[in-house]
Design a protein with these regions (language model features):
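Short, well-structured N-terminal submotif of metal-dependent ribonuclease cores
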Residues: 1-40, 49-66
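Generic structural signal for small/hydrophobic residues in well-ordered secondary structure
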Residues: 7-8, 47, 85, 121
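A generic structural signal for short hydrophobic patches within well-formed alpha-helices
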Residues: 11, 44-47, 135-136
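Conserved beta-strand scaffold positions in the cores of enzyme catalytic domains, especially
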Residues: 37, 72-74, 145-147
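Short, hinge-like loop/turn segments at secondary-structure boundaries
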Residues: 54-58, 92, 146-149
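Active-site neighborhoods of divalent-metal-dependent phosphate/nucleic-acid chemistry enzymes
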Residues: 73-127
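Acidic, PIN/NYN-like endoribonuclease modules and their adjacent C-terminal/linker elements
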Residues: 118, 122-154
Length: 154
């Protein structure tokens, strides 16, 4: 049994029918029991925003709604997720009281939306499946991060 948090890029790949999305299904099978995959409510908001800004047609919006209903949505209003957000935010600035960024590194910057997604995975003890390398500094610190190269799966 594996638990996954699918980042926005992975869900977008499912929506588009991208080859890397097929790779995720074939390799990790996140949507089939006994595995559990969720998406953060933050990813849903990012996808809705993307559709709004890019003036997606009704057909694509309907497809997004259908996909969003298939993948459980994890709210961020949970004490463990709120705590992990604080910890990850401090860690990225090398201000965490008990965790240090590896020697030779000065810090890194995650956007707040990515921190929420990572905090969700960390609180759930889930693997982050992502197309975003920005999550990599968190690998094996707050969660296991599996980077999927969106251009590497043709």
């Amino acid at each position: 049994v594996s638990r996954y948090v699918l980042d926005t890029g992975i869900v977008l790949g499912f929506l588009r029918g991208a080859p890397y999305a097929r790779h995720v299904i074939d390799t990790y099978d996140p949507l089939s029991p006994p595995n559990l995959a969720v998406q953060s409510v933050v990813s849903v908001a990012e996808l809705e925003s993307l559709g709004f800004k890019n003036k997606w047609g009704q057909q694509k919006l309907d497809k997004l709604d259908e996909l969003v209903r298939k993948i459980p949505i994890q709210d961020i209003n949970h004490p463990a997720i709120l705590r992990k957000f604080s910890e990850i935010d401090a860690y990225q600035e090398n201000k965490h009281p008990s965790l240090s960024i590896p020697s030779g590194k000065s810090g890194f910057k995650l956007g707040d939306n990515d921190i929420w997604i990572a905090a969700t995975a960390s609180a759930m003890q889930a693997v982050i499946l992502t197309t975003d390398k920005d999550f990599l500094p968190l690998n094996n610190v707050f969660a296991t991060v599996i980077y999927i190269d969106p251009n590497g799966c043709k």
